[in-house]
Regions:
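A Zn2+-metalloprotease active-site environment signal
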Residues: 2-6, 10, 18-300
Length: 300
């Protein structure tokens, strides 16, 4: 009876904790509260910034902040137009360039954006520099507004809940058998659910990123040249998709090539939203006249 109660509790928790990513329509699990994820991510961000070396290159920092402000403004405008104004209070935007040769960037839940200098070096100073940087930052902000961090934490929590149910079901088994099945269970959740979801997150963030970049006035095609550069920098050494938390560069480029024409058609004619300033915690709100054909989306 106890086993059934535990199992039903897990199922009930999952069924009542689903939400939707508005830009893609994908259903997602949401067992962790907004306040919990924001608090935890802020702690992680502050811990990182205590040890990170903030770039002293004023010109490079200004480039990052300019692009990040426009992407942040596009994100807030999108949330406003699509009726997600309650989420706006969760964003206290900060934009940083740190001295790190790794090809990386991130945006914490709550809008803490960090770009590594190695990413800027890869992008270079060509004509597409700002457009490619917008693809990077748009992707990272995409993770934030799609609440991927919250979803990942929920998946981990569900894994723990599932493990509790498994332990109850196996109550009469030997310790050795319990350990063997528990190990198999862990492998199954890692490679059968958690990693594929992470790859879905990456592709979804790619899509949201080009939408935000387009709204902000950047050329979404630069996302393709960005990933071509990333692929070249890796020497073509993409990890096996089954064992990777990230899709291959080839997969990402393929998905972007399919999505970009649709994104340009749907969002390419919106007027550019007002930008943020580095010292303000939220962006200025764009007007929300909803007249764009097909989506009801217009910013101006």
């Amino acid at each position: 009876m106890i086993k059934k109660i535990i199992s039903c509790a897990v199922v009930a928790a999952v069924l009542t904790a689903c939400s939707t990513v508005s830009m893609t329509g994908r259903k997602q699990l949401n067992l962790v509260s907004e306040s919990e994820i924001l608090s935890a991510s802020l702690t992680e961000y502050q811990s990182y910034m205590k040890t990170a070396k903030v770039s002293t290159d004023a010109n490079a920092t200004a480039i990052v902040k300019n692009v990040a402000q426009r992407i942040a403004a596009a994100a807030e405008a999108y949330l406003t137009v699509t009726g997600q104004t309650a989420d706006l209070q969760n964003y206290a935007w900060e934009f940083n360039l740190t001295q790190d040769d790794n090809l990386n960037a991130f945006c914490m839940p709550g809008g803490k954006i960090v770009v590594y200098s190695g990413m800027l070096k890869l992008i270079g100073n060509g004509a597409d520099r700002d457009d490619e940087l917008a693809a990077v930052i748009g992707h990272e902000v995409g993770h934030a507004i799609a609440k991927h961090g919250q979803e990942r934490a929920s998946q981990q929590l569900l894994q723990q809940m599932g493990g509790s149910v498994l332990g109850a079901v196996m109550g009469g088994a030997s310790a050795q058998t319990q350990q063997a099945i528990a190990t198999a269970y862990g492998m199954g959740t890692q490679y059968g659910a958690l990693l594929p979801f992470s790859r879905k997150h990456e592709l979804e963030a790619d899509y949201i990123g080009i939408v935000l970049a387009t709204i902000a006035g950047y050329d979404a095609d630069a996302a393709i040249t960005l990933w071509q550069k990333m692929e070249a920098a890796s020497g073509g050494a993409n990890p096996a998709p089954f064992m990777s938390t990230h899709p291959s560069s080839t997969k990402r480029i393929s998905e972007l090539q399919k999505a970009i024409p649709k994104v340009k058609a749907e969002y390419g004619n919106v007027s550019q939203p007002a930008t943020t300033t580095a010292t303000k915690t939220t962006t200025k709100k764009a007007a929300t006249t909803s007249t764009k054909k097909g989506t009801g989306f217009k910013i101006g």
